Structures are given as C-alpha cells and as structure tokens.
Regions:
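Hinge/lid segment of periplasmic solute-binding proteins
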Residues: 27-84, 103, 109, 135-137, ...
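Extracytoplasmic/periplasmic solute-binding protein
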Residues: 68-79, 84, 109-158, 201
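Non-transmembrane alpha-helical segments in soluble domains
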Residues: 9, 44, 90, 109-116, ...
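Solvent-exposed loop/turn segments at secondary-structure junctions
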Residues: 2-3, 25-30, 82-85, 92-93, ...
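Extracytoplasmic "Venus flytrap"/periplasmic binding protein-like
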Residues: 1-59, 91-96, 100-103, 193-195, ...
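Extracytoplasmic/periplasmic substrate-binding proteins
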Residues: 21, 29-33, 135, 171-236
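Glycine-centered hinge/linker elements that transmit conformational signals in sensory
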Residues: 112-114, 154-186
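Structural recognition of the beta-strand scaffold that forms the well-ordered cores
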Residues: 19-23, 75-78, 85-87, 122-125, ...
Length: 236
C-alpha cells in the first residue's frame, strides 16, 4: 500500500503518472485533498465530464462518504473496502453466562472480569492505528486531523493529544491491560487474531476480510459493529 502511494506521487512529480491508481483507505484523505491542487480528478467529476451515468447512492453511505469530499461528491471509487468488525466467540459467552454481545465499551467493562475469571482473554484487537485510532475517531464523529480531516486542506497535524475522548480511551486501554481485560500479543496482525481463532479470547476486533477464514476454524462466532463509548456518543 505504502509503496504504491509513494510510486504514484513520484510518477506525478516526474510527469509520468498513471491514469488510475488503487490507493488504500489510509491514503484517501491525501487523495481527496489533492483534488483542489489539480493532482487528482474526482470520480464523479470524471463521470460527468465523459457522460458516464453513476448513481453514488448505490454505495453504502459510510463507505461512499469516506471517499468523498466535504460536499459529498465521490473522489475515489470504493473497490474492496475493508470494514472493522468485532468478532465474538459465542461458546465462551455461553460458558460464562453472558447472553448478549456488548454494544458499548461500558457494557464490555461490565462483563470483562467475568470472562477473565473464567480463564479467557476478554478482548484482543489487531491493528491499533486503524481500529483504535482511525475507526475510533470515525465511530465517535471526532476530527482526527486539522484541515477538516483533510477534506478542506492537506492535514498538517493530528489531534490526538487535544482530543479528550481519545486520551480517555487509551487511558482505559492501559487500565484494561493491567486488569487482564485486554490482551496484547505483538505488533503483527496474526499475533492477536490467533488467540481468538484458537478459542482463547471472547472478543477480537479485526477485519471483515477475516470472516471467510474464520468460518473454517471457529464453529460458533458472530460479527458485530465495533464498540463505542456511550458517554461520548450519547447512545448514537
């Protein structure tokens, strides 16, 4: 992903840019911001220019808007968008007497000790920059960078330290780790997916791309939206 982004930028500077470039989701804000600089032609703009009929409403709103500018016009074409999901091991939940999968972090905190007492890891996640940074800001409707998240200008700084909700969340993660409610097994994606796949953890935050492989090894699990802080969203 990073190599392709760098190669695309280098090719443009050399005057030998490709007609199209598949850019990963983390680079979307950069591409959207470059429309105003004349580097990128937005998808909807190009479709209108060449008389191509496009109904942007055919896309799931959350995915469409991720690749759109601040006016809601699609700049990129969602091709194989990865979605962050919470996987739940229903056998573990049944064993410890939990009937409902939590929707909020507050609900998770209420059941985490019960899971830990049974000898399981309550929660794992596989990619903090995506799951507990990018998706955290998005799910809680918070700005992650200046420049209106890159929609109005190329971002010059992140707003991590200035965002009280984000600081609170990571303080909670530290607390969960110390209590044994959150497991961290290494930087690699598979380091944290493997304990869930092996039946050692109740919940795992990962990608929709793992669903097919998971079905072949874990008999009883569900996929759910990632958790959110009710105290931040007001239940929305």
């Amino acid at each position: 992903y990073e190599d392709n982004m760098a190669a695309t930028i280098a090719a443009f500077r050399a005057g030998d840019q490709p007609h199209y470039s598949q850019v990963y989701d983390a680079g979307a804000a950069i591409m959207v911001a470059q429309v105003k600089n004349g580097v990128v032609i937005g998808f909807e703009e190009m479709a209108e220019k060449y008389g191509i009929s496009v109904d942007a409403d055919n896309y799931i709103p959350g995915i469409k808007n991720f690749y759109a500018d601040s006016d809601g016009k699609m700049v990129g074409v969602p091709f194989n968008s990865s979605t962050c999901l919470m996987y739940a091991n229903m056998d573990i939940l049944a064993e410890v007497g939990i009937e409902e999968v939590p929707k909020t972090y507050e609900e998770f905190e209420a059941i985490a000790q019960k899971i830990a007492d049974a000898g399981y890891i309550p929660l794992l996640q596989s990619h903090s920059p995506w799951i507990w940074t990018e998706n955290f800001f998005s799910r809680h409707n918070l700005l992650m960078t200046d420049g209106n998240n890159g929609y109005d200008a190329v971002p010059t700084k992140t707003l991590f330290a200035e965002t009280d909700e984000f600081v609170m969340h990571w303080s909670k993660v530290k607390e969960w780790y110390e209590k044994g409610w959150y497991g961290y097994k290494g930087r690699a994606w598979g380091d944290n997916q493997a304990p869930f796949t092996n039946g050692e953890a109740a919940f795992w935050f990962g990608s929709a791309a793992s669903f097919g492989g998971m079905k072949g090894v874990l008999p009883n699990f569900t996929t759910n939206p990632i958790l959110y802080w009710d105290s931040v969203t007001g239940g929305k």
